Amino acid sequence: MKVIDGTIASPLGFSADGLHAGFKKRKMDFGWIVSEKPASVAGVYTTNKVIAAPLIVTKTSVKKAGKMRAIVVNSGVANSCTGTQGLEDAYTMQEWTAEKLGVEPDMIGVASTGIIGELLPMDTLKNGLSKLVVNGNANDFAKAILTTDTATKTIAVTETFGRDVVTMAGVAKGSGMIHPNMATMLGFITCDANISSDTLQLALSQNVEKTFNQITVDGDTSTNDMVLVMSNGCALNDEILPDTPEFDKFSKMLNFVMQELAKKIAKDGEGANKLIQVDVVNAPNALDARMMAKSVVGSSLVKTAIFGEDPNWGRILAAVGYAGVDVPVDNVDIMLGGLPVMLASSPVTFDDEEMKDIMHGDEVTITVDLHSGQEKGTAWGCDLSYDYVKINALYHT
């Protein structure tokens, strides 16, 4: 597998565009991804009981059609908690896009992110849609889906399947309300592989637990979380089938793309200065390891300690203990950046200058060794700074 300098439109047969329609005052806020032919599609959605209107529309269409031609996205207005009118507007958003592309409405996915409780300004939407073009600027799409993010989040890779080269690309947004059980988190992945929707869903479902579901910024789960994968077969490879070496290769490719996007989201948490990676190793099973890793990275006390560059192993051990995992914790090792701060559940002395260098970096890795098995789990998050409170205190409803 090779990482390339690409965009969400790098896979064959895809294009994208983004622009400023007026959902926000100045920044880009509207865009789409278009496949030249019907693409296989798979999705995962928020576990929040309050589900935004666009998710209802998209989830229903994915289930009904099993194929997708385009995804249209606005930022600035979430169209969540907007009742019957909000749902009607989401369907209208889908229908207008379908009319412009000359396809059936169920072939269109819709997504929104932004302020909860506001209806979509439909004149703004219609005007923006009239200006979107096929084969537009894919980099602008990555900008158009952002809200409080400080940077775009993209990744593109290639892999060979027999004599054919398959390209996969991803784009995401997310900075606050990131605690998916799957944040607001939106993720879109395009691919030109020949793979059915059912097989694509299998690959997505297998990998989401190890990637997007393992990030947390603030413990809040958004009403609008969605990850969609489209694969249109334009690479002309032999169909990828379950339980084959080709499926395993495709799954690893998808896992890499999703993991890179997840890490970019965690690193760009609201007000964040540092990316935190927690590796729980030598656990009895992978699920327990992932739960424990997420408990540590989600601890507000751990996050504030990392912000303050304090190697506070006590807070880490406390988060290990309340993770809800039935694992002995009387022989735990804890390392910060590879430097031991606890061995066999007892503190150890360490070199202060070496630790200062580790804690001062913009990425801090915490390793928790349970000595009770052979499985591993990883989670990602960020530190908790003064700016997080400031950003969310000023964000209006």
Curated annotation (Swiss-Prot):
Listed InterPro entries: Arg_biosynth_ArgJ, ArgJ-like_dom_sf, ArgJ_beta_C
Biological pathway: Amino-acid biosynthesis; L-arginine biosynthesis; L-ornithine and N-acetyl-L-glutamate from L-glutamate and N(2)-acetyl-L-ornithine (cyclic): step 1/1; Amino-acid biosynthesis; L-arginine biosynthesis; N(2)-acetyl-L-ornithine from L-glutamate: step 1/4
Protein's GO biological process: L-arginine biosynthetic process; ornithine biosynthetic process
Keyword Transferase in record: yes
Any one GO molecular function term: L-glutamate N-acetyltransferase activity
EC number in record: 2.3.1.35, 2.3.1.1
Class in the EC hierarchy, top level: transferase
Catalytic residues in the record: 184
UniProt catalytic activity: N(2)-acetyl-L-ornithine + L-glutamate = N-acetyl-L-glutamate + L-ornithine; L-glutamate + acetyl-CoA = N-acetyl-L-glutamate + CoA + H(+)
Superkingdom of origin organism: Bacteria
Keyword Cytoplasm: yes
Site (Involved in the stabilization of negative charge on the oxyanion by the formation of the oxyanion hole): 113-114
Assembly information from the UniProt record: Heterotetramer of two alpha and two beta chains.
Family: Belongs to the ArgJ family.
Protein name as catalogued: Arginine biosynthesis bifunctional protein ArgJ
